[in-house]
């Protein structure tokens, strides 16, 4: 009886559906990978024995290889979105540009991510690919950075739209008030505007969260592009935070 209640508990059901998704498994592996990256830096700084550091690095490399097939052909949805967004001229122009940059960057990023996988497997070598073998990691980081830049543009534009909308709604509410502080007869409009403001505030919080995640990921991409120099402690911590945010997003979207 207790066993049955446990198995069919809504949280367990949701967890099983969550783990059944390749996207959620990839995010969990990403969390472990960046945790290993952070621990490598931490153990090195603490002068912990070299065997422990090498073990953590080995685990990190194994996880990196395991993540790659879960992202195989992930560029295709972005290519589809690229065509869809380009054809939609009704979108806000700034959001449209941001989404085009985002999907262009991610489409090529995941393409080079596959080449990185082949490189890790030893199928892509300097003999059969020439200079690409040495450039593939940097090119992947470059296109990831382009995709993140597009996402940041979209986030900033969405924030501005929401803030402007709230400002207009507040002005409309204030215009309904008389000079003596009493309310005009159109109280229904005021209630509707307040509800819209609450919805806008929810969008603002989500966009701020997404912007924060994209900025942190940009630090990792900038390092991979060799544009900035950051230690593995900073990069590992940034990756841990963004992985947790990604896991939370997938968990919230999973229906029990």
Swiss-Prot record:
Has the keyword Membrane been applied to this entry? yes
Name the GO terms of the biological process aspect: peroxisome fission; peroxisome organization; signal transduction
InterPro entries named among the record's database cross-references = PEX11
Tell me the compartments it is located in. Answer: Peroxisome membrane
**Which controlled-vocabulary keywords does the entry list?**
Membrane, Peroxisome, Peroxisome biogenesis
Q: Name one GO cellular component term.
A: peroxisomal membrane
Q: How does it sit in the membrane?
A: Peripheral membrane protein
Protein's job = Involved in peroxisomal proliferation. Could participate in peroxisomal elongation or fission. May be involved in parceling of peroxisomes into regular quanta.
Regarding protein family, the annotation reads: Belongs to the peroxin-11 family.
Q: What is this protein called?
A: Peroxisomal membrane protein PMP30A
Q: Which organism is it from?
A: Candida boidinii (Yeast)
Q: Gene name?
A: PEX11A
């Amino acid at each position: 009886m207790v066993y049955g209640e446990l198995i069919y508990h809504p949280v367990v059901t949701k967890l099983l559906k969550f783990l059944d998704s390749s996207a959620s498994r990839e995010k969990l592996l990403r969390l472990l990978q960046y945790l290993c990256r952070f621990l490598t830096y931490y153990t090195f700084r603490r002068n912990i024995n070299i065997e422990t550091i090498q073990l953590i690095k080995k685990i990190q490399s194994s996880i990196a290889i395991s993540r790659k097939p879960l992202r195989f052909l992930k560029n295709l949805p972005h290519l589809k979105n690229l065509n869809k967004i380009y054809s939609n001229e009704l979108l806000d122009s700034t959001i449209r540009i941001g989404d085009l940059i985002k999907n262009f960057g991610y489409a090529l990023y995941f393409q080079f991510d596959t080449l990185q996988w082949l490189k890790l497997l030893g199928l892509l070598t300097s003999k059969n690919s020439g200079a690409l073998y040495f450039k593939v990691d940097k090119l992947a980081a470059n296109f990831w950075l382009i995709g993140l830049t597009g996402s940041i543009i979209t986030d900033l534009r969405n924030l501005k739209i929401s803030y402007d909308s709230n400002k207009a709604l507040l002005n409309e509410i204030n215009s309904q008030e008389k000079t003596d502080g009493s309310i005009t007869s159109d109280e229904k409009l005021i209630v509707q505007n307040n509800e819209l403001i609450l919805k806008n505030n929810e969008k603002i919080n989500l966009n701020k969260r997404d912007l924060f995640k994209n900025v942190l990921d940009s630090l990792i991409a900038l390092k991979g592009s060799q544009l900035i120099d950051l230690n593995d402690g900073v990069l590992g911590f940034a990756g841990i935070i963004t992985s947790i945010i990604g896991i939370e997003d997938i968990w919230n979207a999973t229906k029990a």
